[in-house]
């Protein structure tokens, strides 16, 4: 009897090894054939928050913690520190910057709003009401004297006169936020501070619409795809996309690299088909088919930072912001002749 069972056990063990190896092969992603991201040396080690450019694609501004303010005039290849005399005893953390032409805005915490009309040659402080719900969290320049600002508890305001007056867009705030994203047509999605639920808002609605998260995993970040769908990143490296125009219907969740234990922090589209996914410990993934399959950019995995934010100013100009003053700049790979 033992003589019969011994070969059978060997076959079972061999089959298990084959399955394990197959699982490992699927668990670790293939490397990309090229690396378009270059590390930019910056004169700071502060955590970076946001980047924006004027109507001149070579002239931009970078903001971050402890009043970090950097300017570039060569398309982001080099950056120079700029200081502002704000006259306060404490230090601000700048969290958002946006330009429309030569007119720009910077928000920060504790509550501060800065405005420029000369591409940043001079910055003026815009007074904010003490009754403002929360502190400025993000701002988007919409045009001449026009901008839309959100606070860290989801109050949305718009100005049409350069910040002299502000109109409330929602009647009630949503609560303390972890992350918030805005679509090009003015829709918002916000993740609660603990990642337990998310809320959406569209122009014309009086209040935010709450939604339960799609699984037991807490939400990390959410945003809009280029075709109008929502995407979400959940704890444990999980990614999920919604159905078009239905924020309650979702495709199956998946882990692009389920052998990894780190989480994702941001996702951004360079083109409708090319999607970049950033996470902790220098992890950077890319999909060239709209999120169906993924590859890993292993050339940057030794960068000693978490990648917090991916931003494409245009398909040809992109940046990844991280901790410790880490900035990656996208350089499009020359096409073969």
What are these regions (language model features)?
Residues 11-22:
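Bacterial N-terminal signal peptides
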């Amino acid at each position: 009897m033992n003589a019969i069972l011994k070969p059978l056990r060997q076959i079972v063990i061999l089959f298990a090894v084959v399955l394990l190896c197959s699982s490992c092969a699927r668990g670790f992603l293939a490397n990309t054939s090229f690396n378009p991201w270059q590390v930019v040396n910056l004169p700071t080690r502060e955590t970076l928050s946001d980047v924006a450019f004027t109507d001149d694609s070579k002239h931009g501004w970078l903001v971050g913690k402890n009043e970090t303010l950097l300017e570039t005039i060569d398309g982001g290849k080099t950056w120079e520190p700029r200081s502002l005399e704000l006259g306060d005893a404490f230090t601000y953390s700048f969290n958002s910057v946006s330009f429309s032409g030569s007119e720009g805005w910077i928000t920060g915490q504790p509550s501060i709003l800065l405005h420029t009309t000369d591409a940043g040659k001079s910055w003026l402080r815009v007074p904010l009401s003490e009754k403002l719900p929360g502190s400025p969290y993000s701002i988007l320049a919409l045009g001449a004297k026009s901008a839309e600002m959100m606070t860290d508890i989801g109050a949305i305001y718009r100005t049409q006169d350069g910040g002299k007056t502000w109109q409330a867009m929602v009647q009630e705030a949503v609560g303390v936020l972890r992350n918030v994203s805005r679509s090009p047509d003015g829709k918002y999605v916000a993740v609660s501070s603990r990642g337990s639920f998310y809320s959406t808002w569209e122009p014309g609605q009086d209040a935010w619409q709450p939604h339960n998260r799609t699984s037991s995993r807490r939400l990390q970040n959410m945003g809009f795809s280029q075709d109008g769908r929502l995407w979400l990143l959940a704890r444990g490296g999980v990614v999920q996309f919604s159905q078009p125009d239905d924020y309650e219907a979702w495709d199956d969740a998946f882990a692009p690299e389920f052998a990894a234990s780190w989480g994702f922090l941001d996702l951004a589209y360079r083109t409708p088909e090319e999607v970049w996914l950033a996470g902790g410990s220098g992890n950077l993934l890319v999909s060239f088919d709209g999120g169906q399959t993924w590859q890993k950019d292993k050339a940057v995995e030794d960068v000693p930072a978490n990648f917090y934010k991916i931003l494409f100013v245009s398909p040809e100009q992109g940046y990844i912001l991280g901790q410790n003053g880490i900035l990656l700049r996208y350089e499009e790979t020359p096409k073969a002749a």
